[in-house]
Regions:
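Hydrophobic alpha-helical transmembrane segments
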Residues: 22-27, 71, 100-105, 121-126, ...
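Functionally important transmembrane alpha-helices
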Residues: 119-174
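Membrane-interface helix/loop boundary segments of multi-pass membrane proteins
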Residues: 48-59, 81-105, 133-139
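Juxtamembrane helix-loop-helix connectors linking adjacent transmembrane helices
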Residues: 5-77, 94-95, 165-174
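Structural signal for membrane-spanning alpha-helices in multi-pass inner-membrane proteins
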Residues: 1-5, 33-41, 110, 114, ...
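Histidine-centered divalent metal-coordination motifs
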Residues: 86, 114, 148, 152
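Active-site alpha-helix of zinc metalloproteases
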Residues: 73, 77-78, 86-87, 143-144
Length: 174
């Protein structure tokens, strides 16, 4: 909140209810989910540390949570992170340094805040850019909030409820 004040950016300045923007946000989660499923099942050595983190931390913390709690935490993450990274950081910086530099900087900051592994930080930076562009194009914070929340929920629910450990994780433990 202090950062929003310092940057002269209202927390919820570009957030308004619009069914069309909600649907755009929901549909915009599909490319991110395709990337998630591909990465989850790809045999890439750079993802081995991420697999280990997911198994030892994410699964340990969230495995016993009922599906409704996963939905709530995903919605909260979508709202809080998008308000912070898009509205406060990207929007606030755009007033001072311009739209494109603010998008780039906010995306890098988003990646750094998701620094689980170097690979995931890079992926998160690209996701941050995608969400930032979505906000610029749609002009309503609701779209990236919906994208983020749907992505988090589907990815978390799938990983915890339907995902079998990838072969590369099995090789690590052997």
């Amino acid at each position: 909140m202090m950062l929003a004040f310092f940057l002269g950016q209202p927390l919820f300045g570009d957030l308004r209810w619009c069914l069309r923007d909600l649907w755009v946000g929901i549909l915009a989660s599909l490319p991110l989910l395709a990337l998630f499923f591909w990465l989850l099942h790809a045999s890439l050595p750079a993802l081995e540390r991420l697999d280990e983190f997911l198994e030892t931390h994410v699964r340990t913390i969230f495995e016993a949570w009922p599906i409704w709690q996963l939905a709530v935490i995903s919605l909260l993450a979508g709202v809080c992170e998008e308000v912070f990274f898009r509205s406060v950081i990207q929007g606030g910086l755009a007033r001072h340094i311009g739209t494109i530099p603010a998008l780039a900087l906010a995306s890098v900051i988003f990646g750094v805040f998701h620094l689980v592994t170097k690979t995931y930080a890079l992926i998160a930076t690209l996701i941050g850019a995608y969400l930032g562009i979505l906000w610029i194009v749609i002009g309503n914070l609701l779209a990236p909030i919906a994208t983020h929340a749907v992505y988090d929920f589907v990815a978390l629910a799938y990983f915890l409820r339907a995902h079998v450990r990838p072969r590369r994780m099995t090789r690590i433990k052997e």
